A protein has these predicted regions:
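Short, well-ordered, mixed-charge alpha-helical segments that flank or form enzyme active sites
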Residues: 110-112, 130
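Hydrophobic/aromatic-lined pockets within catalytic cores
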Residues: 53-56, 145, 149
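A surface-exposed partner-binding patch
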Residues: 1-110
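Short acidic-glycine loop/turn motifs at beta-strand connectors
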Residues: 114-117
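Compact, glycine/acidic-enriched structural inserts
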Residues: 130-143, 148
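Short, solvent-exposed aromatic-acidic interface loops
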Residues: 126-128
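Intrinsically disordered, low-complexity regulatory segments enriched in Ser/Thr/Pro
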Residues: 119-124
Length: 150
């Protein structure tokens, strides 16, 4: 389902002469996994890895989904990428946010995983109040994309 939404976004972008970012390679994803483990002490969800292998970061209509950081890429692609490691390090400057792993944000929300509960949340930005809870990354991703396409 989320892949269909990505295709819809792709069509919209192409209609105004923009493109989706290219997919991350296996090597790039592996580098991200290693850095996430080393710097953030987390394993990446398989659904997030699948997203990265479809499109490495997405910036569309106020929704930004993080990708493999530029310093982990095999080659410079000239694409706008909000890096997963970089963005989590920024959000972790606020102590209460260290309980979350951030995958993206919008003008009004963060999309993240509660590390102690294992649940996925849409948090109000900037208060951090839970607006929605999801059982898995895939469902959270689909809802974020649907909202953006409204």
């Amino acid at each position: 389902m989320w892949k269909d939404l990505i295709l819809e976004i792709k069509d919209i972008l192409e209609s105004v002469n923009y493109k989706l970012n290219t997919p991350a390679t296996d090597t790039e994803v592996q580098r991200l996994r290693e850095h996430a483990k080393e710097k953030l002490n987390v394993d990446l969800p398989s659904e997030y890895v699948e997203f990265l292998k479809t499109v490495n970061s997405l910036d569309f209509d106020g929704l930004v989904l993080y990708g493999v950081d530029s310093f982990l890429l095999e080659t410079e692609k000239g694409e706008q990428i909000c890096g997963f490691i970089e963005m989590n390090e920024i959000w972790y400057e606020n102590e209460f946010q260290k309980e979350y792993l951030f995958f993206g944000d919008s003008n009004i929300a963060w999309f993240c995983k509660n590390l102690s509960e294992g649940t996925y949340h849409e948090l109000d930005k900037p208060s951090g109040t839970v607006m929605n809870t999801y059982d898995d990354f895939k469902t959270m991703l689909e809802e974020a994309l649907k909202i953006t396409l409204l």
